[in-house]
Amino acid sequence: AILLLVIALFLPETLPPERRRRDGLRQVLGVWRRLLGDGYFMGHALAGGLVIGGMFAYIAGSPFVFMELHGVRAEDYGFYFGANAIGIMLAGQITARLVDRVAPARMLTMALTISAVSGLALLAVTMTGFGGFAAIVATLFVYVSMIGAVMPLTAARAMAPHGAIAGNASALMGTLQFGAGALAGVALGALQDGSALPMALIVAFCGAGGWMVRRLLVK
């Protein structure tokens, strides 16, 4: 609430007055309806949303998996969580450095592929026990780190053709992404069985689903 107040009071509008829009609810819903039928937009928005959903499953499920199942002390859990946050920042910085040399579409394909592979690898090591706790930590680190590449790339690709309605497109994309995160949390609670499998299953589904939905919808 404080941040919203500061933005409202002190962050100036940079868009020239002649380019500003004052759409009512009907116009906004009409724009959203059009965007929901746009395969290019939805392919990128849903891909990003699914990958983010996997991150929400990690956030909700990892305290139980780390501390209850693998004996990580509460004071040490923050180290693992912080390491993943650093991974996100590093992936974001690497993406920014490569954007002038590698096509964004290719980078996004690579990031989504890594997300899918790491999510499926997490499921495999969870089901088999191969590599133990270290393998779970490593695969989660790779998956979560890719958020730093997937989020900016899906947003840029989704909104590139919609500059005239960038605000509405951004709002819809945010709604879809955080809606996917909420659904991932609900699914985790519904599937919880006292093991690490529900978290791994949702992360794997979200990673593979993000890769698949972009491949199917973006032509």
Residue positions per predicted region:
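C-terminal membrane-cytosol helix-exit motif in multi-pass small-molecule transporters
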Residues: A1-R19, V213-R214
